[in-house]
């Protein structure tokens, strides 16, 4: 009798994706983050579902409903903090996943990479709208500042902002629609992740060397299932430690003050995972210029495959490109730090220099260095 997992229409899909999938024998732990992102998404959808059962998307009761979840609902505090810190873990895994793709040249799988960029935008949109829902001071003012950026779009800007707000300011209509979008987007993300995997399995995984691995493949199960389980356990350990020991470490104290349109917080800033983009936005004095730089800071990822000038795919054997990659990482950490600082000297100039360096590295220095390394091969 033939094996059910190889014949049953549903099991066949699971089998070819997670069991009998031929995988390169040399992929390192940097390849774990795809599965970790899947786990993060499941955790976020489940905790979010239970939070939605008790949350009310009304300006009068939103803040107190979150308080009610934390105080009166059984393990509500745990669900709420798992959801809030789960978002941070999601972004840590996302940044490492994208970084891996950049380092090892995974962006050469064009369709997979572009769906990935789309996923990044979708996750960022979801996280932004989720941050508005508790209706604290930072929620309200963050929503006001970020949505207001759209007014920089020529001609239609002001109308567009009022259309998104559902009125003349961030109010009940805005909160209700943000809740609706925040609820539906994770399911769209899950569907996009399925398409992301579909395109990946058309080509097979890349590997650290960047060389073709067709001659040396091993089945995904048991080798990489065991490896992924280790990653999942470490993720759960980190997340639970964060939730149980210092749940507010990555949050903003201002969000424990109910939203007040008449009182502006001294420093309006987003969650830590948006600070690098926020720093780039603030480093340009012009409003439209800042908005364009903000969008391009993420959209630049879509251009990277076309700027690949090296004869080698991975950076494994390219020491100069490796140096630039780690400078880029340091630059992003600097931008993240600057995004959380007030707009004053010396932070303004540091932010501007870091923003210039960010685009310079990706668009100019890395392609030129790759060409230089190609010439080194001839020596």
Curated annotation (Swiss-Prot):
Encoding gene, per UniProt annotation: MT-CYB
MF (Gene Ontology): metal ion binding; ubiquinol-cytochrome-c reductase activity
Topology in membrane: Multi-pass membrane protein
Record protein name field: Cytochrome b
Signal sequence residues: none
Pfam families: Cytochrom_B_C (PF00032), Cytochrome_B (PF00033)
Listed cofactors: heme b
Lineage: Eukaryota, Metazoa, Chordata, Craniata, Vertebrata
Residues engaged in binding a ubiquinone: 201
Binding site for heme b b566: 97, 196
Organism of origin: Sorex cinereus (Masked shrew)
């Amino acid at each position: 009798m033939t094996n059910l997992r190889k014949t049953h229409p549903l099991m066949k899909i699971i089998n070819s994706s997670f069991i009998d999938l031929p995988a390169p024998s040399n992929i390192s732990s940097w390849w774990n983050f795809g599965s970790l992102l899947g786990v993060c998404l499941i955790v976020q959808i489940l905790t979010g579902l239970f939070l939605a059962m008790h949350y009310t998307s009304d300006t009068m009761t939103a803040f107190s409903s979150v308080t009610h979840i934390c105080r009166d609902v059984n393990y509500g505090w745990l669900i709420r903090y798992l959801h809030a810190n789960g978002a941070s873990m999601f972004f840590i895994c996302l940044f490492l996943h994208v970084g891996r793709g950049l380092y090892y040249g995974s962006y050469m799988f064009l369709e997979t990479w572009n769906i990935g960029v789309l996923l990044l935008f979708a996750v960022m949109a979801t996280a932004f709208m989720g941050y508005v829902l508790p209706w604290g001071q930072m929620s309200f003012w963050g929503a006001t500042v970020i949505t207001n950026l759209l007014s920089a779009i020529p001609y239609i800007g002001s109308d567009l902002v009022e259309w998104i707000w559902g009125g003349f300011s961030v109010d009940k209509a805005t909160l209700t629609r943000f809740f609706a979008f925040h609820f539906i987007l994770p399911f769209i993300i899950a569907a996009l992740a399925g398409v992301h995997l579909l395109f990946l399995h058309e080509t097979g995984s890349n590997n650290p060397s960047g060389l073709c691995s067709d001659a040396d493949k091993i089945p995904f199960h048991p080798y990489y299932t065991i490896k992924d389980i280790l990653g999942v356990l470490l993720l759960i350990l980190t997340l639970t430690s964060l939730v149980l020991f210092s749940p507010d470490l990555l949050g903003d104290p201002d969000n424990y003050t109910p939203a007040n349109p008449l009182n502006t917080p001294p420093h309006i800033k987003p969650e830590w995972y948006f600070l690098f983009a926020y720093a780039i936005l603030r480093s340009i004095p012009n409003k439209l210029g800042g908005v364009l730089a903000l969008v391009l800071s993420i959209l630049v990822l879509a251009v990277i495959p076309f700027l690949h000038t090296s004869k080698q795919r991975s950076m494994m054997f390219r020491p100069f490109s490796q140096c630039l990659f780690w400078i880029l990482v340091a630059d992003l950490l600097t931008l993240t730090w600057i995004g959380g600082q007030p707009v004053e000297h010396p932070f303004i100039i540091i932010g501007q220099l870091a923003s210039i360096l960010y685009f310079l590295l990706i668009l100019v220095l890395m392609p030129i260095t790759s060409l230089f390394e190609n010439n080194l091969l001839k020596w």
